[in-house]
Each structure stands twice: as structure tokens, then as C-alpha cells.
Amino acid sequence: MFIKNLSKNIIDFPKPEKALKDPNGLLASGGDLSPERLLVAYQNGIFPWFNEGEPILWWSPDPRAVLLKCHVSRSMKRFIRPGRCPYHFSLNCAFSDVITTCATKRSGCTWISSDIVKAYCQLHRLGRAHSVEVWLKDKLVGGLYGISVGAMFCGESMFSIADNASKSALIIFEHYFTQKGGKWIDCQVLNAHTACLGAEQIPRNDFLSLLDQAQRVSLPKGVWSPQSLG
């Protein structure tokens, strides 16, 4: 089967159900990484994923991994308990550092290319891409970044260079996000790391229904302002 080659001049994606089954979710190629195209993609359950130097590829896998409710183990509850946790956390205080560290820490993986970093930093400046930082004193030791789509947060990548740093980031962020009216975290494709925190696979159509609901919700003003998360 063939996939659609997108024009750079027209922002238009095929419907997600047109995606291939093998490789799972491959929907289209080409286009660009402009903020307008990226936002349309995420609003329709589509995300870019490609190796540096290769054509841009767009995906919408079925099933889709989603964190509906974070599962926190007893050991992690003890680890992040106030007064015991060695880390402090912040929101949108070091986006560029987080995404560039995600890129450099993924040994053998080159999908967070220089073009991706540039595009998502632009989305951050527009208030649509966000980061969570984990600090050990003044050193950045973990973090994650993603895109906000109404009451859904579309997670892109995370990194950790200290014990439980990325797990702690996701747990702390999920608690904050849901307190502010957030509903779900899109994890795209299930892996062992997100599964242990409660992520599960749901049919793509169910995910798209959640995404539609999420876009009907407006979060309170100031939710994404740079701030300490504890």
C-alpha cells in the first residue's frame, strides 16, 4: 500500500484510519514541521517520527498508548514524598535544555533531530509545547516534554540521568495536570517505562474520541506559566 506524500504548501492530512497496519500507524510522508502543520497533526491524533536525514513521516498507530490514571507504586510514593525526595520540579523553566538532552541521551536513536528541536522550541515560544524539569540542587537530571491539546497532553520524550528522575517527573506532572483540569496523557506507543506507571493501549477510535473531548475543554489561565512544581 502507498501513503500520501504531503505538499509543503497545503496543510492537509489523510484521516487516521487510512494509516497502514504494517508498519503500524504510518499515515503520510513529506510536508514540513511548521507550527501550523504540527498543531493540526496533534489535533487529529497524528505525530511526526523519522530519522534525521530521512523524509518526514507522520504516524497514528492503532492501538494507542494513553495514561488514563497514573499508577504510583509504594516505593515511588515513598521516593517522591515531600521532605524525602532529593529532587525539585519545575514547569516550562528549561524547555530547550530538556529537549536537547532528550536528543543526546537516546543512544542509537536519531529521531529527535536538529529540525525537530528547532520546530518544538518554536512551538514552546508559541505556548503550545511544554517541559517538566527535574533538578538535583541546580543540576538538570531528568525531564519530559510534549504538546498541549486542550485537556490532553501529548507526551513526546523524557530523559533521566539520576534514579527515578523521569518517573518522578511524569508522576508529579500528572498530579498537577489533573488538578488543573487535564484529563489524559497521550503516550503514543506503549513501552515498559510508561506501562509501569499505568499507561495502557486503547483502540485508535477510542483515543480519537478522547482527543475530541479534550479539545472541548479550556484549562485555566496560567496553567502553563513557568513555575515550581515542588
Curated annotation (Swiss-Prot):
<keyword id="KW-0808">Transferase</keyword>
<dbReference type="GO" id="GO:0008914">
    <property type="term" value="F:leucyl-tRNA--protein transferase activity"/>
</dbReference>
<dbReference type="InterPro" id="IPR004616">
    <property type="entry name" value="Leu/Phe-tRNA_Trfase"/>
</dbReference>
<keyword id="KW-0012">Acyltransferase</keyword>
<dbReference type="Pfam" id="PF03588">
    <property type="entry name" value="Leu_Phe_trans"/>
</dbReference>
<dbReference type="GO" id="GO:0005737">
    <property type="term" value="C:cytoplasm"/>
</dbReference>
<dbReference type="GO" id="GO:0030163">
    <property type="term" value="P:protein catabolic process"/>
</dbReference>
<dbReference type="InterPro" id="IPR042221">
    <property type="entry name" value="Leu/Phe-tRNA_Trfase_N"/>
</dbReference>
<comment type="similarity">
    <text>Belongs to the L/F-transferase family.</text>
</comment>
<protein>
    <recommendedName>
        <fullName>Leucyl/phenylalanyl-tRNA--protein transferase</fullName>
        <ecNumber>2.3.2.6</ecNumber>
    </recommendedName>
</protein>
<keyword id="KW-0963">Cytoplasm</keyword>
<dbReference type="InterPro" id="IPR042203">
    <property type="entry name" value="Leu/Phe-tRNA_Trfase_C"/>
</dbReference>
<dbReference type="InterPro" id="IPR016181">
    <property type="entry name" value="Acyl_CoA_acyltransferase"/>
</dbReference>
<comment type="function">
    <text>Functions in the N-end rule pathway of protein degradation where it conjugates Leu, Phe and, less efficiently, Met from aminoacyl-tRNAs to the N-termini of proteins containing an N-terminal arginine or lysine.</text>
</comment>
